[in-house]
Amino acid sequence: MSVFGKDELAMRKFASSMPVPEFEETHFVSTKPLSQAKVAIVTTAGLHRQSAPGFEIGDSDFHYETLARDSRDLKLGHHSVNFDRGGFAADLNVVYPIDRLEELAVEGVIGAVAENHYAFAGNQSATVSEIRLDSGPHCAKKMLAENVDIVVITGTCPLCPRTVCTLAHVFEAAGLATIVITRAREVAERMKVPRALHTVFPPGLSLGKPRDKVFQI
């Protein structure tokens, strides 16, 4: 359980005082209809394959992991203690809604699911400069090369909102449409991201209760 627990006031106070990077411009990419779009997920939950070394402790690991579309043997490699890990243990879709995307593709709601998806660690430095200038643009180029149109971005820990919002700016500037899913409305508004869905769930449960397929969609 997060040290914040379900204390909404404490979470909002933390989000309001969190240092965030500034962007001179907010890009807003128009894309094809959703039913024709290829969608990828980028999460800051630090996910990686069981066989991979994963992420280092601290705020200096800005690399990203590539997650193949059919990979389910994933480990939650985010080292923060400030979020609920039980949800992911029960249902990876609470932070990485890959099964929900597959279902939406079958139903024709989205055009296609991307072949690869990506994971960063959300606990980055206050400037998030390494992701802004290095690994973020590199990840964007990979998705563009794979013909991705839309990126769904999710987080886990209390610091993740700053990282997911930074990634949204980086991806939109590269030509990818994004939607950020975050409980920290204050951070999304201060960072002026193009699109954000505000949730009220505890850290670690970006899409709500585990195994709640209807709600997660």
Describe these PLM feature segments:
Residues M1-I217:
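Metallocofactor- and cofactor-centric catalytic cores in central/energy metabolism, strongly enriched
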